[in-house]
């Protein structure tokens, strides 16, 4: 167990590699109840969120969700989150645990008359059931990604979200906190392998999902981070002017994915020759080599370009690759 954003979290159960492979080949379950949940409700809830979130909420109807960013005036990423449109005038935001209080305060300070922001994190638990057999093992009907619906699983009513942080088919099950332990047991009985933070990190890095605090943050703009696709630059939101400027001019640096060409495991903070830096790194269980992401000068950022990374005092060759680093065959 390790401390994480005020929680005690398991790094592993059986081991990072078997847990990782279970998710890639079958089904694993993560207790992600540390994530924050915020409800935004009222006749002006949509207006409030449209003025603050980078993506365009007009593109989703009730029953759908959207990956989006909360940005500051400089276009920096306060948090990356998922917005669920529960109904007209009512939203649920799933935010990173370490940013939950910050996001809540940011929204609360900007509340409009006719909008109400509430922190409901203590009311809910969240289990991520991920892997190619996850839907089958849970006995659920499949649904398109980034949609959600209410369903009953072994007598427990859940909100079933077709979302995840692994790059695999899967769902995130949201239940009242008092039902969490029973639901966890039911999911294990259905054959899911319990997984910890270690596998969660290696899985997300293989598919190049950014981690707030490593790859993105308040001092990292969305364009440089490769998240311009999340930003509706044709609407106004906090930071939009700066993001439009960076987008038009072109960023000075870019977040790239790479694989190691020599032995060595890259880690956050390791220097990349030419003024760059590793933001995330690990050993890929599926590729059996070191992989990572990091920022380099824009002119260095083409796939196929070679990098030199200082791995514990020794120069090691790496190669920039297209994202995702790992892609499931078929």
Predicted regions and their residues:
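N-terminal glycine-rich flavin-associated loop
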Residues: 32-43, 84-92, 205
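Acidic, proline/glycine-enriched N-terminal capping motif
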Residues: 1-71, 76, 198
